Amino acid sequence: MSGRVLITGATSGIGRQLALDYRRSGWQVWGCGRDGERLQALADEGIIPLQFDGRDSAAMAVIAADLPALDLLILNAGNCEYMDLAEGFDGALFARVIETNLIATGHALAAFLPRLASGSQLAIVGSSVSWLPLPRAEAYGASKAALDYLAATLRLDLATRGIGVTLIRPGFVQTPLTAKNDFPMPCLVTVEEASRAIMRGLAAGRHQIHFPRRFIWLLRLLGALPTGLWLRLGRTLISKGSPS
């Protein structure tokens, strides 16, 4: 199978690997990002580069107007910053993460959703963190939980137009973003493994894609614990300096 796919956040991590793998599979790929040098590296691989800031809705609208119909739209761009409540609630950090992970996704939907016709797919990359409240993840977790709800409502509303919606919820993936983490990351997978799991799930038309399985089951198990017990475990994680 081949077609046309646009991927945001394509200059690094999961997005970059997806762009490369879809291109190698014969797809026409548009890769989006802010970094000109990284976009040029994608262009050298046969990927069509689109440079814009995800917070710039006007720039996205101009770019989208020149695009053909898409078979697949993958909204992957995002960032993670952890909060240290010992210093107080950082409203500026919270706003930055919400703007990058949630508001920019809304801008991308406004710009690129009209390029999807009946039979096409929309994929939104959330996070497995939305299954379980983790320490210091007030901003990141809130932004990803909001994407869960967004994907669920879009799935209902776009079904009448014949557009499938998939929510992707990865566990820890070895990327430049997670390389900054200062805590253990169980069941860490490579970007190649993540890309394969995502491409398989999208090809199968799944509503949700989550991986790796062992980590997801662990999160679900912990999420089923009584709140009081999880609070005690959370305090232990905080005392050990994890992002809990």
For the regions a language model picked out, list residue spans one by one.
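Conserved glycine-rich cofactor-binding loop
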Residues: 11-12
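C-terminal helical subdomain
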Residues: 167, 183-218
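Conserved NAD(P)H cofactor-binding loop of Rossmann-fold oxidoreductase domains
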Residues: 76-83
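Rossmann-fold cofactor-recognition segment
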Residues: 44-58
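Residue(s) in the substrate-gating loop at a strand-loop-helix junction
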Residues: 127
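Substrate-binding pocket helix/loop in short-chain dehydrogenase/reductase
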Residues: 84-86, 90-96
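Active-site helix of classical SDR
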Residues: 109, 143
